[in-house]
């Protein structure tokens, strides 16, 4: 089989990962980390969303895209991660921000290449955490963590209809009902709402001594 005009010679999935980053101390107790990455998915094996026939029962000449259980795709993931950390005897402060893109390419039955966002393509993600240790023996620990992320992509539903199983020769449309059919929008063309979460935690340590 071929993908994007190139012969597919192996069933293995392939990817090349490029990454570069740096970490340095801004001032005492304050550390900055910056990291960029690019992942080139040369060959991916995915579930075939376009399958309409079983491979054994498909009419002669049916394209592979309409009869195979799996399909070949390519893709890329790239982005930037930035984190900042401050730490002393009482305080621990940490923040991280990620900017990311994850896209895949697939071919339709006419060998035209299409690009879509994956369902885990989150554009912005941020985490902030603060921890304070109190008490003469550091027995109290109070912490808070906040997470924010933009919504994940999803495939929207365009319409519902009654699907009649005409492949069954005994089906009578006058006396029997069909089942629910769904017409979907473009793949992952929708986006879920943004997500945020705040966790607050209080811990107390107890020390026991032997008499």
Predicted regions and their residues:
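General secondary-structure edge motif
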Residues: 2, 61-64, 110-111, 175, ...
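Structural signature of outer-membrane beta-barrel channels/translocons
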Residues: 13, 23-25, 29, 85-89, ...
């Amino acid at each position: 089989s071929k993908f994007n005009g190139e012969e597919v010679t192996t069933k293995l999935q392939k990817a090349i990962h490029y990454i570069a980053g740096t970490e340095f101390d801004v001032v005492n107790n304050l550390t900055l980390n910056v990291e960029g990455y690019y992942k080139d998915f040369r060959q991916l094996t995915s579930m075939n969303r376009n399958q309409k026939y079983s491979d054994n029962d498909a009419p002669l000449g049916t394209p592979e895209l309409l009869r195979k259980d799996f399909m070949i795709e390519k893709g890329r993931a790239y982005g930037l991660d930035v984190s900042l950390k401050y730490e002393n005897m009482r305080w621990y402060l940490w923040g991280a921000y990620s900017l990311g893109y994850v896209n895949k390419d697939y071919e339709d039955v006419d060998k035209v290449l299409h690009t879509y966002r994956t369902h885990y393509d989150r554009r912005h993600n941020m985490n902030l955490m603060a921890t304070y240790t109190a008490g003469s023996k550091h027995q109290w620990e109070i912490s808070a963590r906040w997470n924010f992320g933009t919504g994940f992509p999803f495939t929207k539903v365009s319409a519902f209809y009654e699907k009649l199983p005409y492949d069954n020769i005994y089906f009578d449309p006058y006396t029997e009902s069909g089942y629910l059919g769904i017409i979907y929008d473009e793949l992952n063309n929708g986006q879920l709402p943004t997500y945020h979460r705040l966790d607050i935690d209080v811990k107390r340590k107890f020390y026991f001594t032997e008499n």
